[in-house]
Amino acid sequence: MAEPARALRVVRIYLDGAHGLGKTTTGRALAAASTAGEGVLFFPEPMAYWRTMFGTDALSGILAASARCAAASHGSARARRAGAPRRRGRGGPGCVLPGQVRGPVLNFARARVRAAAPPGPAPGGTVTLVFDRHPVAACLCYPFARYCLREINAEDLLMLAAAMPPEAPGANLVVCTLPPAEQQRRLAARARPGDRADAGFLVAVRNAYALLVNTCAFLRAGGDGATAGTRWSGRTQMHWPRSQTPVVMNAKCAGAGLRDTLFAALKCRELYPGGGTGLPAVHAWALDALAGRLAALEVFVLDVSAAPDACAAAVLDMRPAMQAACADGAAGATLATLARQFALEMAGEATAGPRGL
């Protein structure tokens, strides 16, 4: 009888944050840091998918629709409706990919009634999967920024947030940050066509990620999305402002209060039909689903002001504190093939698998 493959420890890291910070550069530096037995697989942002796979440049269409909304007196209803399908489409690759990765990781775990990996080294070694963005970017943070600018309504935002796929055990989100002036400088230097760099939008995106970090801290500390929903009576509206005031990020990811979260920011009249005081059940269910997805994330914050190699080293230094999952040792080759295929089709580039897999 063939000897079973030794258990492989799988650490999944999603690099996320506002655009123009240097996430992709940090991800590539992480991939270059692969060593024997400690491979790093990089899943880049799917630029080729958005720009070439459908015969039209979908990314340019999304950005153009966004610009039209911004120019049309904070977004007319017609412009918002026209842009919604494109916004949902942008999340496609990121929403599908977790399911492909989940297969080889969780099939082994289910067979042993164990999903999370125990602490310490695994017999089959460790593989780190690094993703350039989590679905939370397309499904929540960027739509939320546009909601704050009154370019989309709360209904669209809730619909997009509810579409975020559930996470398998072992997901770690590293939210990248930069001082605003340095972000502007890097955006100008990369000069990507269609990049939206107006100050109001950048503040809104940074606020979205700050609230995301605070929300995850609130949930991990025992905060309950359902409780948050029931506390939203019409008489206790929090009136979180759709303003340009920067939100303070709970950088240590410690406990945060309800008022510092996305739940407070979504306390709005639009979700209460007819001016009622009770939150409709369907909205409460959507918010509870969102809370469940966010609670599964272990969140870290990283200032990426340093050189890419230093940022990559900082991420690797976070790994002992990160959650992990188990896979059969044979899954390493499957994951390496998946990473190569994704990089080739979604980013238009070939990438070699890491050493040690």
UniProtKB/Swiss-Prot annotation:
E.C. code:
2.7.1.21
Q: Which Gene3D superfamilies match?
A: P-loop containing nucleotide triphosphate hydrolases
- Give an example GO biological process: TMP biosynthetic process
Sorted keywords for this record are: ATP-binding, DNA synthesis, Early protein, Kinase, Nucleotide-binding, Transferase
Q: Which Pfam families match?
A: Herpes_TK
Alphabetically, the GO molecular function entries are: ATP binding; thymidine kinase activity
Q: Which reaction does it catalyse?
A: thymidine + ATP = dTMP + ADP + H(+)
Q: Where does substrate bind?
A: 192
Among its keywords, does the record have Signal? no
Q: Which SUPFAM superfamilies match?
A: P-loop containing nucleoside triphosphate hydrolases
Where, by residue number, does ATP bind?
A: 17-24, 186
Q: Where is the active site?
A: 45 (proton acceptor)
Listed under subunit, the entry gives: Homodimer.
Please describe what this protein does.
Answer: Catalyzes the transfer of the gamma-phospho group of ATP to thymidine to generate dTMP in the salvage pathway of pyrimidine synthesis. The dTMP serves as a substrate for DNA polymerase during viral DNA replication. Allows the virus to be reactivated and to grow in non-proliferative cells lacking a high concentration of phosphorylated nucleic acid precursors.
The family classification in the record reads: Belongs to the herpesviridae thymidine kinase family.
Protein name as annotated: Thymidine kinase
List the source organism: Bovine herpesvirus 1 (strain 6660)
Q: What is the lineage of its organism?
A: Viruses, Duplodnaviria, Heunggongvirae, Peploviricota, Herviviricetes
